[in-house]
């Protein structure tokens, strides 16, 4: 008997894009996420940010075996009670609200969650944490992001007794990243499970009380040799969906 193919929800960016004769806002996601999930044996399903008064994010989870929260623009600092820094990018309030609600509903169901870059930051904020809005102010360097449109290569040190180490298959990992923000206050119930070699920037967070809840600041989908997405999809394969009506 063949293994069940898990449905993996993939959150989308909101960007103004040009295609053909049209320029308009669109929901989009880099194909690297889609292909990484498919290579690992999952069925990627794209989830566009939708206002909560139109779609209850928790009802979407009836269709899913796991959620991957993708990278993208900065989160509105108001979501963690701070004013915007001069270097904070223009925010997408609808996406912020949608993903925070989606994560909280997924956590309630103990559905596997993987947060990538911004997605890790969404997990942290959903747990009541806060973000450092511009790391170069403190670090006095910007090695966590490459030139425009290019990922930076660096290394992270992973705690040996962590989900991050189990998923990555190593405690010292070469990664690709592109970010200027990071975790300043870790969310309630989360643990730091990886840090950047050299400057100690928080690179991974997880909730050991959950089946699989992991956020990484790097981009595992950009490296075909990376094992994280595969570990996540395997956990999704074993997940059991719990329809909303049955929980009522």
Q: Where are the predicted features?
A:
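Conserved G/P- and acidic residue-centered "switch" motifs that form tight phosphate/ATP-binding loops
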Residues: 117
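Active-site-proximal beta-strand elements of phosphoester/diester hydrolases
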Residues: 214-218
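N-terminal beta1-alpha1 cap of cysteine-dependent amidohydrolase-like domains
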Residues: 1-114, 124-127, 132, 136-167, ...
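Hydrophobic, aromatic-enriched interface-forming segments
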Residues: 120-122
């Amino acid at each position: 008997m063949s293994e069940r193919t898990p449905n993996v929800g993939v959150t989308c960016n909101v960007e103004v894009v040009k295609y053909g004769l049209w320029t308009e806002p669109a929901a989009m996601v880099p194909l690297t996420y889609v292909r990484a999930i498919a290579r690992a044996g999952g069925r990627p399903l794209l989830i566009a940010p939708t206002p909560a008064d139109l779609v209850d994010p928790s009802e979407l989870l009836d269709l899913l075996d796991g959620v991957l929260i993708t990278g993208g623009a900065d989160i509105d600092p108001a979501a963690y009670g701070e004013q915007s820094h001069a270097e904070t990018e223009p925010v997408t309030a609808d996406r912020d609200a949608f993903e925070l609600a989606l994560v909280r509903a997924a956590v309630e169901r103990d559905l596997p969650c993987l947060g990538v870059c911004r997605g890790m930051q969404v997990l942290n904020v959903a747990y009541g944490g806060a973000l450092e809005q511009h790391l170069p102010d403190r670090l006095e360097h910007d090695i966590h992001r490459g030139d425009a449109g290019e990922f930076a290569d660096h290394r992270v040190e992973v705690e040996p007794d962590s989900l991050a180490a189990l998923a990555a298959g190593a405690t010292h990992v070469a990664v690709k990243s592109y970010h200027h923000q990071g975790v300043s206050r870790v969310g309630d119930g989360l643990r730091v499970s990886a840090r950047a070699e050299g400057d100690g920037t928080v690179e991974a967070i997880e909730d050991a009380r959950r089946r699989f809840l992991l956020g990484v600041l790097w981009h595992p989908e950009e490296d075909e040799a990376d094992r994280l997405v595969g570990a996540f999809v395997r956990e999704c394969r074993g997940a059991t969906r719990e329809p909303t009506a049955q929980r009522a």
